[in-house]
């Protein structure tokens, strides 16, 4: 089997984890106690779900996941919640005191006390796998645990499991909706540390998701539950190909091969369609062409940036539900002719397509309508550099005055790490700029040296 281990770090990671595993269980017909009714009609005898669940002798299905937080309250909710019997108690790991939005606490002081325990749990999960293909790490950029502990964990995973792919789902600090003042510091420190260890990172911007909830689902004040359920649909679409048999199947390494042209340029933009409330869906057709077009609307993206200002390097469309290749090809052909989609000149306009016949599942009582087909587009575009630029600007404003830096230094960091991280981010922005430049321009520059 091609197993994946999910690691959920910090409050954001754990809460997204709750939403994701709730959805996986519904999709595979697994009850909250881990039992799967024996009639097997739901999965149709398809055992691909074993990539995400391991089965015990008693027929209980246990998620291949670890939940880690440096303070107990969030994971305690899992321990007492609906799905408390689903997880092995050892998979829920908590510390005593939290990282207090401080990268240095998550990475150095408090993180190092718990890291060996976490790695031991991960090793136990890895031992149960016959052919582990990689890790999915869920975390936020802004929090102390999400930024600091994740970067520590990624470094250690690279040492212990060097060849395995590591994919991240990272919550990018929203431009307007901020939960901590020091988010720009944490984000840039964690990006710098994790850059060389992560193979592919899907960023999710809370504000973009807020707007989608407000605009498409008519939720006036979206809660984190609303956001997480939407995020879990996207994660589910990305991982569906690993969990179900489909016509065109995609595995973890295949994503990287198709989306990451250079090791550092590994931040694809995710777009999901249709996000629509039940009363609207009733009156709309939502054909393959409709949902494919919707993917190219900046309004449906998970990060606020404008791909019309950037260039595409790669594009991957993952359909699920009632979709036939003929419709997909027609939809893509139309888009290629009329859209203002610019590909970089060194990459011919290739769209990679995955089709999965399992229709999207919705959480009962949730906000999304039950639809026959959905699509998730992953595109590697230079426009995402806008997101980095925004973050770097905020970092600069604070760091120019050395605001809040003493909290980090007090936990054993050196000020040099800040400037080093900031330089790395500047280099990343420059990388994106160069990748988007036409290859002809680049050659002229070369002659001057």
Swiss-Prot record:
A motif (MREC motif) lies at residues 1-4. GTP binds at residues 11, 71, 140, 144-145, 179, 206, 228. Residues 431-449 have a biased composition (Acidic residues). It catalyses: GTP + H2O = GDP + phosphate + H(+). The keyword Transport does not apply. Residues 430-449 are annotated as: Disordered. Its EC number is 3.6.5.-. Its cofactor is Mg(2+). InterPro entries: Alpha_tubulin (IPR002452), Tub_FtsZ_C (IPR008280), Tubulin (IPR000217), Tubulin/FtsZ-like_C (IPR037103), Tubulin/FtsZ_2-layer-sand-dom (IPR018316), Tubulin/FtsZ_GTPase_sf (IPR036525), Tubulin_C (IPR023123), Tubulin_CS (IPR017975). The record marks 449 as: Involved in polymerization. GO terms for biological process: microtubule cytoskeleton organization; mitotic cell cycle. Some glutamate residues at the C-terminus are polyglycylated, resulting in polyglycine chains on the gamma-carboxyl group. Glycylation is mainly limited to tubulin incorporated into axonemes (cilia and flagella) whereas glutamylation is prevalent in neuronal cells, centrioles, axonemes, and the mitotic spindle. Both modifications can coexist on the same protein on adjacent residues, and lowering polyglycylation levels increases polyglutamylation, and reciprocally. The precise function of polyglycylation is still unclear. It is an enzyme of class 3 (hydrolase). GO terms for cellular component: cytoplasm; microtubule. Keywords: Acetylation, Cytoplasm, Cytoskeleton, GTP-binding, Hydrolase, Magnesium, Metal-binding, Microtubule, Nucleotide-binding. Belongs to the tubulin family. Dimer of alpha and beta chains. A typical microtubule is a hollow water-filled tube with an outer diameter of 25 nm and an inner diameter of 15 nM. Alpha-beta heterodimers associate head-to-tail to form protofilaments running lengthwise along the microtubule wall with the beta-tubulin subunit facing the microtubule plus end conferring a structural polarity. Microtubules usually have 13 protofilaments but different protofilament numbers can be found in some organisms and specialized cells. This is Tubulin alpha chain. It comes from Xenopus laevis.
